[in-house]
C-alpha cells in the first residue's frame, strides 16, 4: 500500500476520534455548564442515531487496529446505513479496503467521500493522496488545490506537505519546494514534508542541505525504509561511507525486506 504514506494521519485519527470519547459534548458545552433544562439524548431519535453512527465508526476503527477487516467493514457499512450522506463512513471503508490491499476499491470510496464533502480539506486531500500514490501525481494536485482553497483549514499543513511531495513526483519542482516550505512553516516537524524536502535537495544536487532535512526527518518520526534509503544515498554522494554504512546496517536490522529495494521506490 505505497500510497498510504501520503494519507493525512489527521484524517484517520479525527475519523476514529468521533467515537472514541464517550463523553460526547454538544455545542462545545462541557463539565458543569448548563444553558437550559436537563433532557436525555434518549428522547431525541436524531441524536440517538448520531451517537450510534459515531459508535459504529469507533468500532470499525478499533477492528482495523486489530486487523479484523471483515468486522471493521460491517461496522463501517452500518454507519453508512445510518447516514449515507456523510463522507466519514466512506472514508473509513476506504481505509479498510486500502489496509486489505484493495487499492482500486479504496480509490472509489475516497472519491465518493470527496464528492460528498467538496469543502472539507481533509477529505479532498485524502483522495488526492490516493491519486498521487497510484500513479497520478499531476491529477492529484487538482484535489490538493481544492483542499488548500480554505486558508483556515486545520488540515492545511498536511495538505501542503502532500501537495509538495506529489508535485515533486509530477516533476513540478518549483511548486514542490514552495508547498513544502509553506508546510514546514506551519508544521516544522511534518515528517513527510521533511523527507520530501530532502528528496528535492538531492534533485538539485544540494547534498549538505539534503542531509540537514533527512536528519530533521529522523528526529521527527520513526525511521522508514524510504528515509533510510534516502540517507544512504545522500551520505554516499557526500562521500561519507561510514555514515552510509551505519544506515545500511540499520536498514538490514530494522527492515530486512527493504534492504534490497530501490532507494527511489
Regions found by a protein language model. Give the residues of each.
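Structural marker of alpha-solenoid helical repeat scaffolds
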Residues: 48, 82, 116-117, 150-152, ...
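N-terminal leader/linker segments that initiate helical-solenoid repeat arrays
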Residues: 20-77, 81
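Terminal, low-structured helical/coil segments at or just beyond the last alpha-helical repeat
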Residues: 24-44, 217-265
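TPR alpha-solenoid repeat register
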Residues: 89, 123, 156-159, 193, ...
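Canonical positions in the second alpha-helix
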Residues: 78-79, 112-113, 146-150, 182-183, ...
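Canonical tetratricopeptide repeat
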Residues: 58, 92-95, 126, 160-162, ...
Amino acid at each position: 500500500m505505497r500510497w498510504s504514506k501520503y494519507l493525512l494521519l489527521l484524517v484517520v485519527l479525527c475519523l476514529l476520534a468521533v467515537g472514541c470519547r464517550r463523553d460526547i459534548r454538544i455545542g462545545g458545552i462541557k463539565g458543569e455548564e448548563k444553558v437550559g433544562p436537563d433532557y436525555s439524548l434518549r428522547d431525541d431519535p436524531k441524536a440517538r442515531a448520531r451517537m450510534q453512527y459515531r459508535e459504529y465508526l469507533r468500532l470499525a476503527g478499533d477492528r482495523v487496529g486489530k486487523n479484523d477487516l471483515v468486522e471493521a467493514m460491517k461496522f463501517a457499512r452500518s454507519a453508512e446505513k445510518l447516514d449515507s450522506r456523510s463522507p466519514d463512513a466512506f472514508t473509513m471503508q476506504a481505509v479498510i479496503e486500502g489496509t486489505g490491499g484493495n487499492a482500486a476499491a479504496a480509490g472509489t470510496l475516497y472519491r465518493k467521500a470527496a464528492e460528498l464533502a467538496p469543502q472539507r480539506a481533509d477529505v479532498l486531500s485524502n483522495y488526492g493522496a490516493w491519486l498521487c500514490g497510484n500513479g497520478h501525481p499531476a491529477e492529484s494536485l487538482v484535489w490538493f488545490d481544492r483542499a488548500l482553497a480554505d486558508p483556515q483549514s486545520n488540515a492545511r499543513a498536511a495538505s501542503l506537505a502532500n501537495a509538495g511531495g506529489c508535485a515533486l513526483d509530477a516533476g513540478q519542482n518549483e511548486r514542490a519546494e514552495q508547498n513544502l516550505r509553506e508546510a514546514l512553516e506551519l508544521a516544522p516537524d511534518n515528517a513527510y514534508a521533511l523527507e520530501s524536502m530532502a528528496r528535492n535537495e538531492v534533485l538539485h544536487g544540494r547534498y549538505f542541505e539534503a542531509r540537514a532535512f533527512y536528519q530533521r526527518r529522523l528526529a521527527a518520526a520513526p525511521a522508514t525504509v524510504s528515509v533510510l534509503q534516502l540517507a544512504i544515498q545522500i551520505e554516499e554522494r557526500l562521500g561519507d561511507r561510514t555514515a552510509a554504512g551505519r544506515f545500511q546496517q540499520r536498514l538490514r536490522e530494522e527492515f530486512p525486506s527493504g534492504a534490497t529495494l530501490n532507494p527511489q521506490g
